Each structure stands twice: as C-alpha cells, then as structure tokens.
Amino acid sequence: MADSSFDIVSKIDRQEVDNALGQTAREIATRFDFKGTGASIEWQGEHAIEISASADDRASAVLDVFKTKLVKRDVSLKVLDASEPRQSGQQSKIAIALKEGISSEDAKKISKLIRDEGPKGVKAQIQGDELRVSSKKRDDLQAVIALVKQQDYDFAVQFTNYR
C-alpha cells in the first residue's frame, strides 16, 4: 500500500483578508463614532496594512473592527503582527504585517513534536516553508493532525493535500 501524506502550512487567504479590509473601511465610513476622525485602513504593499486615525484610541478601535471582520471570515488572528500606535504628524498610525509561511525553527519544533509524541512510523519532512507528513496508515495521520491542533503555536496552521 502506498504512503498517505498531508502538508502542514501557514498560508493567508488574501481574498478573505481583502474582503475583511473592505468591510472594515465601509463600517468606519458609516459609524458615528468615527465621523471626523480621519480613520482609514488600506493596503501598504503585498503583505502589509496601515491604519490611520486622528487619535491612538480611534486607531485601536479600527484595529478591533478589522479583527472582528477577520474572525467572521475564518481568518486566524495569528497571521497579524500589529505594531503599537505611533504618531505621524496629526495622525496616529498602526502598521500591520501579515505573517505567512512556517519558519525553519518552527518547522523543526513541529517535526520534533511529531517524532516524540506522534504515532510510530510517521515521517515529517521540512520542504521550504511547509512540512510534509507521511505514514502508511491514514489513522496515524489523523492522530498527528489532532496532536498539532492541540498545540498553541504563535502562527496559523492549516492542513492541505491530504492523500
């Protein structure tokens, strides 16, 4: 029987993030408490978002609205790396970086966890910014998925290519 396998990845669904950003922009344009604050949220390049408002608390409120919209769209908040509000002239700005991919150190942690606590006969291979897990038994792979889901990593984890 051939080996079964799946990949452990940390990817961002950019379309869902873009939809959440658009919803947030519409909400802050219509909400009364944001009138006259100059609050805005927009993309800054491919993997960064910038929030600006007239005060720190308004910028933080926009960030909270954005996080709420992301959660409703099933995007993990672990992909966000938000800075503290900083003053830039009359505006308060928050820079948000989007984290994607599993670093080699994190991949090694997951691989060690699978070797130490996972079922026997399961192999984990690091392939760039993802991890390929393979085994002869599909039940073992299900056990590995449950094991990895139990852990609380500081990055989002998805399971793809289950075969």
UniProtKB/Swiss-Prot annotation:
Write down the CDD domains for this protein, in alphabetical order.
Answer: YajQ_like
Which InterPro entries does its entry note?
DUF520, UPF0234-like_C, UPF0234_N, YajQ-like_sf
Q: Which GO terms describe its molecular function?
A: nucleotide binding
Which terms are listed as keywords in the entry? Nucleotide-binding
Can you quote a single GO CC term? Answer: cytosol
Family per similarity comment: Belongs to the YajQ family.
The UniProt function text for this chain reads: Nucleotide-binding protein.
**Cross-referenced PANTHER family:** UPF0234 PROTEIN YAJQ (PTHR30476:SF0)
This chain's protein is named Nucleotide-binding protein Noca_0564
Provenance organism: Nocardioides sp. (strain ATCC BAA-499 / JS614)
